[in-house]
Every structure is written in structure tokens, then in C-alpha cells.
């Protein structure tokens, strides 16, 4: 199944998943409350890598469910019916027949009834693939993101490490992605 229609759910207890049409990407509502997009085979954990996470691991009380609501919002609820993550698409677009699709590009997309995109994660490209294993469905879960990062889009790309012998610059802020040398702004 690659589509979650309005009124449908993914449950953390049922091991239900969404799988892209090409069978390359899997979206899993995990027992720890984390909604995670994986690339690779679920048959072999060594071939499975995390691409995106809702960063809702450990929030609320399990079991959890992902719901495509009638108002257009994609929401993760805990067992006490408290929302622990949402796409923020409530009331957007043309009302009725909302759906969430896992595209063959590795994108999670929420549509209205006229296929207008209300929410989208970034497409998965070779440049963005992570080589770090992430929360395994059958293992001990870890968060897919460090605590300071948001639970949508791709994790921040690592920057250059500080260069030895170069003190931090004062004055103009450094350009992201480029190491700064003393006296250069």
C-alpha cells in the first residue's frame, strides 16, 4: 500500500507500513512513537537506512496511530488520544478526499481532492542518502535526528569541522559551509 486515504490509519501495534510503488521506500509507524521513512529492504536490517523521521520517539504513551484526518491534517496520536506530531495541513487546500502518498521518489506528500500538494518532504536523491542505520523496527529504537533538529525534511548536512589554529571570528558572521581564516570576512 502506498496511499493512506482520509479516515485511514497506520498503527504501531499492527506492523502496518506504507511502501512506495517501486518498493524502495517504506514508511513505518514504530512502537516508540516515531514515524520513520526507510530506504532498503525490511528483510535485512543491514540494508535499511533512515531518510526521514517525525522525531516523535518516546513522546506520549503507546501504542500510536498515524491518521489522515478529514480536515487534511496528517497526525500521530498516542493511546491517550493526544497529538504528538502533525503535518500542519489542517484546513488547507480544497476540502474532502485528502490523502497521503509515499512517492517512488521517497517523498511523503499530503494531497487535497484535486491533487494539490499541501505537505511534502524533500525528494530523496543520491546526495541526501544517509549511510547511518536508524531506528530499527525490531531492535532498540533510536531517534532518527539529534534532539536539536526538527522532525521534518532532511537532517542538517554536516558542516566543516573547526580548523586547527584558526580562532573563532568576531564581527561578520561566518559563511555556512566554508571554514574561516583569521582576518578574512
From Swiss-Prot:
Its main location: Golgi. Keywords: Actin-binding, Cytoplasm, Cytoskeleton, Golgi apparatus, Lectin, Membrane, Repeat. It is found in: Golgi apparatus membrane; Endomembrane system; Cytoplasm, Cytoskeleton. GO terms for molecular function: actin filament binding; actin monomer binding; D-mannose binding; identical protein binding. Gene3D superfamilies: Bulb-type lectin domain. The N-terminus is blocked. Sequence repeats lie at residues 153-158, 159-164, 165-170, 171-176, 177-182. SUPFAM superfamilies: alpha-D-mannose-specific plant lectins (SSF51110). One of its GO terms (biological process) is response to other organism. Residues 153-182 are annotated as: 5 X 6 AA tandem repeats of G-Y-P-X-Q-[PH]. May have a role in cell motility. It has high affinity for both G-actin and F-actin. Binds to vesicle membranes via mannose residues and, by way of its interaction with actin, links these membranes to the cytoskeleton. Homodimer in solution. This is Comitin. It comes from Dictyostelium discoideum (Social amoeba).
Amino acid at each position: 500500500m502506498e496511499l493512506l486515504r482520509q479516515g485511514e490509519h497506520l498503527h504501531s501495534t499492527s506492523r502496518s507500513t506504507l511502501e512506495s510503488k517501486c518498493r524502495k521506500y517504506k514508511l513505518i509507524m514504530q512502537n516508540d512513537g516515531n514515524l520513520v521513512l526507510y530506504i532498503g529492504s525490511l528483510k535485512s536490517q543491514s540494508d535499511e537506512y533512515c531518510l526521514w523521521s517525525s522525531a516523535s520517539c518516546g513522546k506520549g504513551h503507546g501504542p500510536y496511530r498515524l491518521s489522515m484526518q478529514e480536515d487534511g491534517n496528517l497526525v500521530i496520536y498516542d493511546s491517550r488520544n493526544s497529538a504528538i506530531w502533525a503535518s500542519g495541513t489542517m484546513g488547507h487546500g480544497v476540502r474532502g478526499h485528502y490523502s497521503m502518498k509515499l512517492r517512488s521518489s521517497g517523498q511523503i506528500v499530503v494531497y487535497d481532492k484535486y491533487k494539490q500538494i499541501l505537505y511534502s518532504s524533500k525528494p530523496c536523491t543520491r546526495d541526501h542518502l544517509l549511510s547511518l542505520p536508524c531506528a530499527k523496527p525490531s531492535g532498540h529504537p533510536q531517534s532518527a535526528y539529534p534532539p536539536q533538529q526538527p522532525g521534518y525534511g532532511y537532517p542538517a548536512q554536516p558542516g566543516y569541522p573547526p580548523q586547527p589554529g584558526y580562532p573563532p571570528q568576531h564581527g561578520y558572521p561566518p559563511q555556512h559551509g566554508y571554514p574561516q581564516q583569521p582576518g578574512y570576512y
